[in-house]
């Protein structure tokens, strides 16, 4: 996928997640509230979680500073200052990782870490440093998977995970690693189909599914994926719901004329 397309997808995805997390950040532990507590999320997996380890006062202070750094990073990123955003995110991430390691079952902190890594990836992507973007995507992947498993009705997290998988698949496909890209697209397809099944009229859901189908059709010999991608492209081109990222591929698949 062209670099411009990747950055466009990053912009779309960041717009979906940043406001949601901005409301959760103030609820992070404070110096008088230890981060390691018994999980209260009713949607958490039923299996036994690793025992929590109490954070030290120093670690709690560092975590509180990380909340401030993350918030500053968001502000910088939203104003277009991605270099400052990266500096702030990278200052925040180590303390957030420590909190997650102290209590892996505390989903608020898992969510915080997933968002921090993802936002950092987006900032690097906006600066054209796509190798770092993909590396951060890979680092964030287990945390997004954990969130989606714990909160199966959270469509926003599910779509972000699908988008990450698609971009990682695109990177491998661009390097001619079809075998490496195929399972990433397959996982993304499952997630995207669920989102479309829940809300078939949502354009974000449809475009994520189309992206996954386009990738899957190029990474395997399964002609069903290409057939589905062609049919979906025709419908979305006709009703105008295809986004700028998918439009060139949709036009190529259907033989539709391309502008310019």
Model-derived segments and spans:
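Sec-dependent N-terminal signal peptides
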Residues: 1-23
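Flexible helix-coil transition and linker loops at the boundaries of alpha-helical arrays
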Residues: 54-60, 97-110, 145-158, 193-204, ...
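Structural motif corresponding to the intra-repeat A-B loop/turn of tetratricopeptide repeats
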Residues: 79, 120, 127, 168, ...
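Residue register of alpha-helical TPR repeats
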Residues: 60, 67, 108, 115, ...
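Residue-level recognition of tetratricopeptide repeat
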Residues: 67, 74, 115, 122, ...
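N-terminal leader/linker segments that initiate helical-solenoid repeat arrays
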Residues: 22-90
């Amino acid at each position: 996928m062209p670099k411009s397309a990747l950055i466009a997808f990053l912009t779309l995805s960041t717009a979906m997640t940043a406001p949601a997390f901005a409301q959760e950040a103030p609820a992070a532990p404070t110096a008088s509230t230890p981060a390691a507590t018994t999980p209260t999320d009713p949607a958490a997996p039923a299996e036994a979680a690793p025992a929590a380890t109490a954070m030290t006062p120093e670690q709690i202070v560092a975590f509180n500073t990380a909340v401030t750094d993350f918030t500053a990073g968001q502000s910088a990123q939203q104003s277009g200052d991605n270099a400052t955003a990266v500096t702030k995110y990278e200052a925040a991430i180590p303390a957030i990782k420590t909190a997650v390691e102290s209590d892996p079952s505390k989903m608020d902190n898992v969510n915080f870490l997933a968002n921090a890594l993802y936002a950092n990836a987006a900032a690097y992507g906006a600066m054209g440093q796509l190798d770092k973007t993909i590396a951060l995507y890979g680092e964030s992947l287990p945390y997004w998977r954990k969130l989606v498993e714990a909160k199966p009705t959270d469509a926003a997290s599910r779509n972000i995970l699908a988008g990450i998988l698609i971009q990682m698949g695109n990177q491998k496909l661009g390097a001619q690693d079809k075998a490496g890209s195929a399972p990433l697209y397959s996982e993304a397809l499952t997630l995207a189909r669920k989102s479309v099944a829940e809300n078939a009229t949502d354009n974000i859901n449809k475009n994520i599914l189309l992206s996954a189908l386009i990738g899957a059709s190029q990474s395997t010999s399964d002609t069903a994926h290409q057939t589905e991608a062609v049919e979906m492209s025709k419908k979305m081109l006709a009703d105008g719901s295809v986004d700028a990222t998918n439009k060139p591929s949709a036009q190529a698949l259907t033989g539709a004329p391309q502008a310019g």
